[in-house]
Structure formats: C-alpha cells, structure tokens
C-alpha cells in the first residue's frame, strides 16, 4: 500500500492515524476545511509529534501533504488512492460522505478497478458501517454492485488520548499524544489485500474491543471529568489523583468490566490490568487534559448506546452491581458549562421537569425504573 487520503487534519488525525500511516511509509494526503492548516501542511510536508509516556520524545512525521476537503482535488486523490481514513468526529461523517461517493464514482469512471478500503476512525460503534450507508445515498444505484465488490468499509476501534495543543507552543502543526495507542480493525471487511501497518491490529471480533474501550476508557474518562468538576479540579490528572475520585472511577470500570467479562469472555486478571493501565494513563503528568473537554456534550454521552448508559444496561441484563455507574450518571447530570450548548440544555431540562423526566428523555431509561430512582437519590446527595 502506497497512498492514503485521511479526512481530518486535527490533533487526532495528525497525532494518531496519520502518524501510524506515515510511519509505515504510506504517503498521506490530509483533507480538511481549515485553510491555514491545509496551507501549512502542504507547504511543509512534515510536522512534529510529541509522544509522552514515562518519558517524552519528539518524532517528525514526513511524506505528508494536504488538500482542502471541499475541493475537487480531494476527489481526484480518492481516484488514485489505496486507502481512505477519517478522524473528523461522528457528526462530520455525513458531510464527507458525498465527497467520498464522488471520488468512488470518478475512480470507476477513470477505469481504476483496484480495491479501495475505507476506515472511519471515530469514537462511535461501527462508524464505518454508518459512513457506508451515507456514501451509498450519494451513489447512483447502478454503481452499488460494483462498490459492494471493490470497496471495503472497514469498522475500527481507536484509542489514544490526544489533548488540545499547548497554547504556549508557536508551531501550529505540532501535536502532543500519549505513548499508548490502539487501532483495531475488522479483518473480515477488507477488499483485496489486507494492509500491514504497524500499530493497526486485526481481529474477527471487533465488537468485543469496541465495547471494551467504550466501557473502560470512555466510561472512566467521563466519570473522572464529572466528579472532578464537582470537586473543582481543572484537569483529568488532578481529578484522578484525588483518592476518593480514583476509587469511585475504578469501581465504576470494574462494574462495566463485569459486563464485558460475561458478554465476551475476557480474562478477569487481564481486564483488571487493562483498568489499571487506563488509570495510569489518566494520571500521565505530561498530558494536560481539561475536565471540560472530556465532559463536554453530556447529552450525547448520556445516550443509550454511549459510555454511561450502555454499560448500565449491561449490568441490568446480567443482574450485576452498578452503584458506581449510577453515581457517575448522577454526576453527569450535575455538569455545568455555559459555553457548552448541551450542558446548558441539560441544566434547563433538570430545572423545568426534574431528574426523572430528564433521564427518561435523554437516556431511554424508564422514568419509573429502579435505576432512575437510585440516580435521583444520588443526584440529590452530590
């Protein structure tokens, strides 16, 4: 594999997926709507990534360029590329679907019948399958059979903490990332040869890893943020270094972990080690990750398929403990941030209709359920 088009030249695109591809000697073309960013990348064709773990190292990523994702140029790149990846955020997938569809149609018209694989690297379950549905809406029906044959829509699970760039840094392209990274793809969805990229793991059981990440990293991260906000902590590291918060977050991850162990057969000791590794990642002294960034969009995070309610539903399914998950949900309801429209809407709903009706509206939990009653009690105690 020689070429990739990557939609989204933000911190995750540059610091995670783009870096892994470039490190594997793939020529990466970033596609983004941020004109100054595109200009910088296409002019310099390299950028620095600060990788922080137990120590700090700076890597230079080369063999990259960039085009505007609203231009004809990105369509022409899709005509010739071997791989398309995205890190744009779930809401933007629907917007870029039309561009990808135009690229596929033009690719076939130009006679390029080599297999093309597309991997959405987003914080959502089966994000590429969702993207596929949107792409097909923009494709002529006469092309569907050919796309089915030649274009692989490959679902993935991604995990790497990439906080916003430090304001003090005068290099707009430099990005800071943690040393830990996990990119797991569904091997069965590729068309043609499955690419070999260091750092991209292949599996036949993707959903187990999607839920492991959602129920552990994402669940723990947002509960750390919401409890941290209540205690006046500014960063995730400050919050997790509070022993009471750390214990609460660990217990919540163990409750969600019990669901994973029963559902997918994860080894109990190995999963416990995974939880400990995540707690250590939250305490990384080199990562300045603000609780407001991690806690933002609380309504989305309270959705039935997201990081708080989905593990809770699993504990109900298996009849297992969930007290700490319930407390995490109560803490999410307390989240206040005047610059976050979802936080404002959530607080307005709580004031107007109360806890039970707000939970029923946003989480799909039944208003008269035992869980909602417990969350209301915990909410009033926080």
From Swiss-Prot:
GO terms for molecular function: mannitol-1-phosphate 5-dehydrogenase activity. The keyword NAD applies. InterPro entries: 6-PGluconate_DH-like_C_sf, 6PGD_dom2, Mannitol_1_phos_5_DH, Mannitol_DH, Mannitol_DH_C, Mannitol_DH_CS, Mannitol_DH_N, NAD(P)-bd_dom_sf. Its EC number is 1.1.1.17. One of its GO terms (cellular component) is cytosol. Keywords: NAD, Oxidoreductase. It catalyses: D-mannitol 1-phosphate + NAD(+) = beta-D-fructose 6-phosphate + NADH + H(+). Gene3D superfamilies: N-(1-d-carboxylethyl)-l-norvaline Dehydrogenase, domain 2 (1.10.1040.10), NAD(P)-binding Rossmann-like Domain (3.40.50.720). NAD(+) binds at residues 4-15. It comes from the Bacteria. GO terms for biological process: mannitol catabolic process. NCBIfam families: PRK02318.1-2 (NF002646), PRK02318.1-3 (NF002647), PRK02318.2-2 (NF002650), PRK02318.2-5 (NF002652). PANTHER family: ALTRONATE OXIDOREDUCTASE-RELATED, MANNITOL-1-PHOSPHATE 5-DEHYDROGENASE. Belongs to the mannitol dehydrogenase family. This is Mannitol-1-phosphate 5-dehydrogenase. It comes from Vibrio vulnificus (strain YJ016).
């Amino acid at each position: 594999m020689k070429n990739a088009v990557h939609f989204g030249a933000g911190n995750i695109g540059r610091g995670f997926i783009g870096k892994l591809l470039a490190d594997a000697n793939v020529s990466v073309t970033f596609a983004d709507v941020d004109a100054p960013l595109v200009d910088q990348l296409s002019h310099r064709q390299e950028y620095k990534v600060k990788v922080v773990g137990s120590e700090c190292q700076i890597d230079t990523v080369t063999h990259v360029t960039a085009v505007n994702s609203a231009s004809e140029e990105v369509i022409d790149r899709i005509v010739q590329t071997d791989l398309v990846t995205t890190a744009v955020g779930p809401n933007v997938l629907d917007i870029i679907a039309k561009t990808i569809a135009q690229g596929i149609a033009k690719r076939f018209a130009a006679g390029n019948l080599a297999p093309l694989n597309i991997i959405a690297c987003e914080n959502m379950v089966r994000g590429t399958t969702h993207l596929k549905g949107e792409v097909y809406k923009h494709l002529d029906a006469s092309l569907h059979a050919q796309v089915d044959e030649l274009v692989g829509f490959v679902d993935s699970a991604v995990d790497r903490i990439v906080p916003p760039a430090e304001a003090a840094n005068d290099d707009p392209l430099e990005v800071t990332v943690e040393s830990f990274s996990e990119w797991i793809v569904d091997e069965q969805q590729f068309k043609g040869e499955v690419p070999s990229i260091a750092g991209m793991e292949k599996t036949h059981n993707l959903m187990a890893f999607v839920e492991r990440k959602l129920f552990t990293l994402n669940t723990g991260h947002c509960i750390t943020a919401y409890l941290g906000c209540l205690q006046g902590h500014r960063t995730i590291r400050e919050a997790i270094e509070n022993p009471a918060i750390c214990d609460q977050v660990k217990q919540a991850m163990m409750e969600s972990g019990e669901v994973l162990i029963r559902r997918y057969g994860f080894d109990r000791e190995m999963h416990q080690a995974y939880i400990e590794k995540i707690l250590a990642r939250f305490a990384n002294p080199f990562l300045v990750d603000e609780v407001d960034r991690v806690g933002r969009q609380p309504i989305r995070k309270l959705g039935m398929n997201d990081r708080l309610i989905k593990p809770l539903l699993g504990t109900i399914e298996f009849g297992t403990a969930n007290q700490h998950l319930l407390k995490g949900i109560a803490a999410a309801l307390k989240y206040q941030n005047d610059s976050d429209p979802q936080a404002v809407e959530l607080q307005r709903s709580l004031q107007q209709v109360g806890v039970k009706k707000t939970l029923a509206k946003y989480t799909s939990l039944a208003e008269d359920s035992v869980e909602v009653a417990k969350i209301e009690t915990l909410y009033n105690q926080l």
